[in-house]
UniProtKB/Swiss-Prot annotation:
This is Odorant receptor coreceptor. Heterodimer with conventional odorant receptors (ORs). Residues 1-43, 95-133, 212-350, 405-455 are cytoplasmic. It is a multi-pass membrane protein. Belongs to the insect chemoreceptor superfamily. Heteromeric odorant receptor channel (TC 1.A.69) family. Orco subfamily. Residues 65-73, 155-190, 372-383, 477-479 are extracellular. The chain crosses the membrane at residues 44-64, 74-94, 134-154, 191-211, 351-371, 384-404, 456-476. It is found in: Cell membrane. The keyword Iron does not apply. Keywords: Behavior, Cell membrane, Glycoprotein, Membrane, Olfaction, Receptor, Sensory transduction, Transducer, Transmembrane, Transmembrane helix. GO terms for cellular component: plasma membrane. One of its GO terms (biological process) is response to pheromone. It comes from Harpegnathos saltator. Odorant coreceptor which complexes with conventional odorant receptors (ORs) to form odorant-sensing units, providing sensitive and prolonged odorant signaling and calcium permeability. Obligate coreceptor of all odorant receptors. Orco is a universal and integral part of the functional odorant receptor, involved in the dendritic localization of other olfactory receptors. Can form functional ion channels in the absence of an odor-binding odorant receptor. Plays a central role in the perception of olfactory stimuli in ants and is essential for ant social organization.
Length: 479
């Protein structure tokens, strides 16, 4: 069967999509062929059933051990910790159309021949960073699952029962497993112990990866948007220099049209002037069909005798009408690309905003209980290692999307600074108007909100960290 060639963000994020498919997310698009789609649906349903089964068994164990406050707190933290994964698997399955729409939003971006090199460079940078992010988070997740498993065998778990009548303490040995869980059979020895160990390792690994793969997808979208904003800031200066040719006689102005980036413009300043190319041989005789979204903008024909001729060109700058049109089209390219980025960020917020709200609600409760658990640490042991591991991992999840949300805010607001810093005063009147509009539009930063309740930024991370530290200090004082 013929393989389907992916494009846009789907092609860029294909490794992430494959990870999501392999670990049980309900991604039923983007197959190389349709033969495996049915099998993948069966796998996703079976995987979700196994994950929900172990989650329910842990909940039953929580109810059984609810008499002891410390056991109740520890079991609650475990359930809340893995609630992220269950929520995100179901959330993606229910709202998958929003994710597909976001993946497809960059399938047909506008382009411009003068800035193709800059666009390709920043796209390559974004692609490299997205792959690196996926690798780092994936490696951290696998190492966390391995560390969880190894830590299990450092200490034999026990449970203390206190008789309310005689006040006698009875110690019960528990199965040496990754999770405290109820099973209707003896899982402490024999083949059943091995089977349960394998099942729990599979459960921990899949749950961690299912949650983090969706977080990495969210961060990759924001990373891509930030690099596109970098691209727009980088071409602002050459855009103004190109625009200056429309109003002012510039010697060798045809050199400006060879610039694909600001670096090229700076490199060409000290070069000897090239000979004027014959009419019709200029590199500006390019296909402009991808610059505009409609044909009315570029299908207009110009009379060859229109305007004043100057050195074989049209107008006092020595530019042909087609060259002037190319300069003006560069401004429209910038505006349309910025609108495209805004649409991408809006789609990301629609797809993932409510999941962020659920994540922060669960994390707040988890960190509150972990602060209580931290007051019980009295030495270097398995309890201390597991508590510290929970805290670092939970804060790491919040920091991951907060750092990228904060960068989006910074990059979107710095566009205004880049527009003002370029030589807009040497540009054409329409370029000056363009800079004024850019400064007005970019005063409000692009951002991602958690269903309108909070903005994803480092301020959010700082507030969560500060609240947890304050609560911990209060508990220490009360203790």
């Amino acid at each position: 069967m013929m393989k389907m060639k992916q494009q846009g963000l789907v092609a860029d994020l294909l490794p992430n999509i494959r990870v999501m498919k392999f670990f049980g997310h309900f991604v039923f698009n983007y197959y190389d062929d349709n033969s495996s789609k049915y099998l993948h649906k069966i796998f996703c349903c079976v995987n979700l059933f196994l994950l929900l089964l172990q989650f329910a068994l842990c909940a039953v164990n929580l109810i059984i051990e609810s008499a002891d406050v410390d056991d109740l707190t520890a079991n609650t933290i475990t359930l809340l910790f893995f609630t992220h994964s269950i929520v995100k698997i179901i959330y993606f399955a229910v709202r998958s159309k929003y994710f597909y729409r976001t993946w497809a939003i960059w399938n047909n971006p506008n382009s411009h021949p003068l800035f193709a090199e800059s666009n390709a460079r920043y796209h390559a940078i974004a692609l490299k960073k997205m792959r690196l992010l996926l690798f780092l988070v994936g490696a951290t997740t696998v190492l966390s699952a391995i560390a969880w498993t190894v830590l299990t065998f450092f200490e034999h778990p026990i449970r203390k029962l206190v008789d309310p009548v005689t006040n006698e303490t009875t110690i019960i040995e528990l199965p040496q497993l990754l999770l405290r869980s109820y099973y209707p059979f003896d899982a402490s020895k024999g083949i059943m112990h091995v089977i349960v160990l394998i099942y729990q390792f599979y459960w921990v690994l899949f749950m961690l990866i299912d949650a983090n793969s969706l977080d990495v997808l969210f961060c990759s979208w924001l990373l891509f948007a930030c690099e596109q904003l970098q691209h727009l800031k980088q071409i602002m200066k050459p855009l103004m220099e190109l625009s200056a040719t429309l109003d002012t006689v510039v010697p060798n102005s045809s050199e400006l049209f060879k610039a694909g980036s600001a670096e090229h413009l700076r490199e060409s300043e000290n070069q000897p002037p090239p000979p004027v190319p014959p009419q019709g041989d200029s590199m500006l005789d390019l296909d402009l069909r991808n610059i505009y979204s409609n044909r009315q903008d570029f299908t207009a024909t110009f009379r060859p005798t229109a305007g004043m001729t100057f050195n074989g060109g049209v107008g006092p700058n020595g530019l042909t009408k087609k060259q002037e049109m190319l300069v003006r089209s560069a401004i429209k390219y910038w505006v349309e690309r910025h609108k495209h980025i805004v649409r991408l960020v809006t789609a990301v917020g629609d797809a993932y905003g409510f999941a962020l709200l659920l994540h922060m609600l669960t994390t707040t409760i988890t960190l509150t209980l972990l602060a209580y658990q931290a007051t019980k640490v009295n030495g270097v042991n398995v309890y201390a290692a597991s508590t510290i591991g929970y805290i670092i991992y939970t804060f790491g999840q919040v920091f991951l999307f907060c750092i990228f949300g904060n960068r989006l805010i910074e990059e979107s607001t710095s566009v205004m600074e880049a527009a003002y810093s370029c030589h807009w005063y040497d540009g054409s009147e329409e370029a000056k108007t363009f800079v004024q509009i850019v400064c007005q539009q970019c005063q409000k930063a692009m951002s991602i909100s958690g269903a309108k309740f909070f903005t994803v930024s480092l301020d959010l991370f700082a507030s969560v960290l500060g609240a947890v530290v304050t609560y911990f200090m209060v508990l220490v004082q009360l203790k």
